[in-house]
Amino acid sequence: MNNTIKDFDLDLKTNKKDTATPYVGSRYLCTPGSCWKLVCFTTTVK
């Protein structure tokens, strides 16, 4: 679990703008790599 969180944080920092825009509007528009993790993480948190 720690590994996933670390990877998610790193990806989010690397593509903050890329993941922030599509994730807010359409989570399906983003790529199935870092965005997918972001959506999954956000869904779990919310």
From Swiss-Prot:
Q: Which GO terms describe its molecular function?
A: signaling receptor binding
Under what conditions is it induced? Answer: Induces its own expression in at least strain M25.
What biological processes does GO assign it? Answer: defense response to bacterium; killing of cells of another organism
Residue ranges annotated as propeptide in the record: 1-24
- Miscellaneous note of the record: A longer form (streptin 2, with three more amino acids at the N-terminus) is probably due to incomplete processing. Other forms also exist, some of which are due to differing levels of dehydration.
- Main function: Lanthionine-containing peptide antibiotic (lantibiotic) active on certain Gram-positive bacteria. The bactericidal activity of lantibiotics is based on depolarization of energized bacterial cytoplasmic membranes, initiated by the formation of aqueous transmembrane pores.
Family affiliation: Belongs to the type A lantibiotic family.
Protein name (record): Lantibiotic streptin
- This protein's encoding gene: srtA
